């Protein structure tokens, strides 16, 4: 569709073309695929389990004992505790093939930064992470983790000092050092080929899910649910099933204080089409087309744009997008911790919170697979300020 593209300075066009060519070459390179699969298995710990959430399923049963069956795709069990590592590992290998020794990345919650620092340590690459000063405060432990792993973390003070500003700063660095540097973008956003590339490196989530579902119950999931910030974990789960018209795809955005306030990050629910960070997509913008600062209790969903492919899936009606508030996410954070002994990331908690709306509408025995995109260790401090336990 009209989404995506390469709205970037001339200096980056060559790098993007080089990247795209390298990506296509490696996609059919058995040696590269073998190396990547080996690392995903032995270092990341794939495949991740498809787990039947028995007590959560019980919780959503109606009075007559009917209700959906809820499964969690356990990306929180990957090395470093989130889906982010899938993409980081693959892009680091790609950078090595391109002969680039210097890696830069942007990070919001710090998860992508930690994943990038992790793979740079693993492959012996120089690592510079751009992070908004405000996010550095919110996620001090992740800042320490990145430094511990040998990365240099650069604070970004411009704008609201959050993810959007960190991304702009990382792009600036890349323009200046494009010959020596590979930019590991952490979501399905940014200029082509990034959205496609990041999706391809995460589609292992959906591929495993199809195989595991077939093994567990001899069919497909009926409904897929995932949280959406930029949208990489959702795209990783959805992509495999886009052609399966009988599988519902549901993305859950951050409604912050509510979608009718000015404090939310529900881009697909409330945004208009515009250009940010090199690609055309839905964006949160004011009447003058200026990007509005998003808000979410979850630093990883706090982004004013969204991946172009999600914008496309929304427009053609293939995927549905809804949103849940900070409070609903916090309630789910506690609920799932209590019911399943799984402390989910606040990002993931948005998807889990949506079960409150979704489950009452589903027929008996419908199989829901929810992408448990990350673990909540990083969010316990934030949650402790709001939750009474």
From Swiss-Prot:
It comes from the Eukaryota. Its EC number is 4.2.1.20. The modification N6-(pyridoxal phosphate)lysine is found at residue 84. Its main location: plastid. It catalyses: (1S,2R)-1-C-(indol-3-yl)glycerol 3-phosphate + L-serine = D-glyceraldehyde 3-phosphate + L-tryptophan + H2O. It holds the Pfam family PALP. CDD domains: Trp-synth_B. Coiled coil: none annotated. PROSITE patterns: TRP_SYNTHASE_BETA. It is found in: Plastid, Chloroplast. One of its GO terms (biological process) is L-tryptophan biosynthetic process. Its cofactor is pyridoxal 5'-phosphate. InterPro entries: Trp_synth_b_CS, Trp_synth_beta, Trp_synth_beta/beta-like, TrpB-like_PALP, TrpB-like_PALP_sf. Pathway: Amino-acid biosynthesis; L-tryptophan biosynthesis; L-tryptophan from chorismate: step 5/5. Keywords: Amino-acid biosynthesis, Aromatic amino acid biosynthesis, Chloroplast, Lyase, Plastid, Pyridoxal phosphate, Tryptophan biosynthesis. One of its GO terms (molecular function) is tryptophan synthase activity. One of its GO terms (cellular component) is chloroplast. Tetramer of two alpha and two beta chains. Belongs to the TrpB family. The beta subunit is responsible for the synthesis of L-tryptophan from indole and L-serine. This is Tryptophan synthase beta chain 1. It comes from Zea mays (Maize). The gene is TSB1.
